[in-house]
Amino acid sequence: MKKYLLYLAQSHPNFRKAELESLADLYGIKVDLSNHNENSPFMIVQLENDEQAKKLVKRAVLAKAIYELWGHGDDLEKMHEDVKRNKDKLVGRFKKSRFKFVILQYQGKKKTRKQQTKIMDSFQYLGLEGKIDLENPEEKFTVLETYTIQKSNLEPRPEPDHCWFGRLVQLSVRSDGIVDKYEIAKRPYYGTTTFESELSLVTCNLAQVRDGAFIYDPFVGTGSFLLASAYFGGYAFGSDIDFLTLKGGRPGKKNIKNLEDDFEYYGTHDKFGDVICMDFTNCALRKDMKIDTIVCDPPYGIREGVKVCGTTNMASAELTKTTLIEGQHVFLRKDYVQPKKSVSLDFMLDDLLQFAADRLPVGGRLCFWMPAANDADIPTLIPQHQRLELIHTLVQQFNKWSRRLLVYVKRDEHYNGKTVTREERAHKNNFRERYFSQFS
């Protein structure tokens, strides 16, 4: 086993470990991530080789890079001592490679050219014989430093808290600009409830979306999860009860943009299967239709309530059954708009878990977001199903509420997990009511 240094993003740090665990599991990599610290962007791990390191980090959204670790210490001097102990077994393969040095600081001030040159010159004992190539090096030897911000003046301490030296093995998609590329405002089509780009991509990694997999979002909206799925190679399919959201506006309106335009914009149109207008609680998909992965953000009921087909006005419903237009029952006409009624989110989630238990293959994943009130005295009960193992509960905090990303894995018939139905959750999980009453 070899030591590697992970350089992580300080964005959503409580999601980082779970994302790496999911990617490690996807590629069959055994790695101990128990040293993960949410307050630090650096973590040392042990892997068998560079190929494992590349697979672990390449598509990670909350990691920046991974380095073959050559040495580290509490200051530059101690770091050099450690590198000198290891150099004989590390330098040989790269002695004649074209190279460059990179110096990175976390929370520290960028060093002057003179300071950088001094640090680079201090590595002459490595005996590197290759040419320095700043444009297209074969190897990038990197010094990474972390600093503490002083409370007195909010400036970094003059000296680093710790230093690492390593050889760059792999940059992540984050370092290649994927989060910025999928920024909502850059898309041809988006809406008020469009899910943020960064966590859409993270969610798809936790769902283990892979090349050629069938991905389904039953509450597709403006399609953030499908776009992210297509980026990772999945075939994207979805449904939504809102026809206008799927089509981008009313028929006949000029210059309408819709989800398909976003796929064209990102060059992933070949991964776009289709989206259909459907009430998920009255699913029109075949019973034997298998789905590899389900990723979604069910309607919470803050900006948009939870709607299903139906009506609470029984008199109107009876009238609809008998009304004819041009000799045709009104509910059979193409221009008929199905009435909708509100239901609780818990009602929807039970259907979602049962759907996943029926349709996913063993090992397939269901990932969805669920809101919760930030009430210390009232815990939120998480939906459970006996065939689905809940492996991650990840929280994104807001002011008076939070949302949780729940990650389930479908297990075989021998697994008999816990079931928590909507009847058990209903009293504690009435999120919409508590949100608009300020959780009082």
Name each model-derived stretch.
Residues 88-152, 156, 163:
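A short N-terminal interaction module
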Residues 82-93, 283-290:
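Short amphipathic alpha-helix with an adjacent loop that forms part of the alpha/beta core around
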Residues 29-30, 82, 130-133:
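A short, well-structured beta->alpha microelement
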Residues 23, 79-89, 122, 126, ...:
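Residues that form generic nucleotide/phosphate-binding pockets
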Residues 58, 62-88:
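A broadly used, surface-exposed interaction patch
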Residues 1-60, 65, 78, 107-110, ...:
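Class I S-adenosyl-L-methionine-dependent methyltransferase catalytic core
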